[in-house]
Amino acid sequence: MERELFIGIDAGGSETKLAVCDGRGNLVGYGKGGPANHLSVGLERMKESLVEAMNDAGCSGLHFESAYIGYSGLGIWSPSELLEKIGHEVIDTDRLAINNDCYNALYGGFGGESGIVAVTGTGSMVLAIDDDGEVTRLGGWGHILGDWGSGFRIAMDAIQVALKVHDGTVDSLLHDKMMSFFGFDSSRAIVRYFYIEQHSKSEIAAFAPLVIEAAVSGDREARRIVEANAIEIARTAVVMYNKVAVAPRLAVVGGLSKSEFFMEQLRWGVSGWLKLCKPLLQPVFGAVLIAMNNFRKVDKPSLERLSEISGEYEREGRL
């Protein structure tokens, strides 16, 4: 009897991550590809990213009992049928489900059990799942209307301060960090980058770690920006807890969750309301869990094995 295989894909705005596991939660393959938010890079590039991840994992040509793709940018105005069709073109499976990539994080946070999960990556949102499996979402308005507490928002807040430094109205290290990071040599270059050239949100959000670095070193403006964004996530999580009947626990995923300084501010913001917990599974393994559950309810040993692998990959910096 051939081994049952399950594939989960975290098709994010910055990169695509893919994991293949067997029915017992053992890892068979792991791969990465480029950005996969079709709203930012288009459907053709999105498909290329899926193929890149499949090839990187060495799983092209395999048949899967169940597959799940969490697409960044999948929402009310997205071509769901077309995204599903592309998924079938890339993956050999009779059982494919797709949804927004936030569900990868939500089901990974506590293995699909009650709790709140905050996503703090290029974008941001807060989600909750109750004992009945009902999902509630706050935030997630995108980079134009919201994304408070995200890498993109921290980067843009810092860039605006940097321009004030350029004008001489504020004192901060952020101007020099911005000029160096983006390779600007003049004010004309700054304007050209943001108003004329085409740059992705993830490229801009990549500046956020330098803002946090400046905050840790004592830069007042950088500290204010990071603290304010962390508190926005904390405030939204507390509002969620008061709105929905869920367990009083919060897991945080995304690039900013790796910053001790950011997490310290967030922990302070939810103190007395929510217990800050380590996610059971990183989002890509949350996607695998969804694929497995769509075929057959995952047993406890398999879930524990998935969690072990997820933890190993996180500790080794392989995610």
Cite the ranges covered by each PLM segment.
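Glycine-rich phosphate-binding loop of actin/hexokinase-like ATP-binding domains
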Residues: 113-166
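Glycine-rich beta-strand-to-loop/alpha-helix junction loops that act as flexible
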Residues: 68-75, 120-122, 248-258
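Short beta-strand-loop/turn "lid" adjacent to the catalytic site in phosphate-handling enzymes
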Residues: 54-97, 109-110
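Short, active-site-adjacent cap segments at secondary-structure transitions
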Residues: 75-77, 104-106, 125-126, 257-260
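ATP-binding/phosphotransfer module of carbohydrate and carboxylate kinases, centering on a glycine-rich
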Residues: 1-58, 64, 86, 108-114, ...
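Conserved phosphate-binding catalytic cores of ATP/NTP-utilizing and phosphoryl-transfer enzymes
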Residues: 1-2, 94-117, 134
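Active-site nucleophile and cofactor-binding loops and adjacent substrate-binding regions
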Residues: 96-104, 119-120, 275-285
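Short glycine-aspartate micro-motif
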Residues: 6-10, 64-68, 97, 115-119, ...
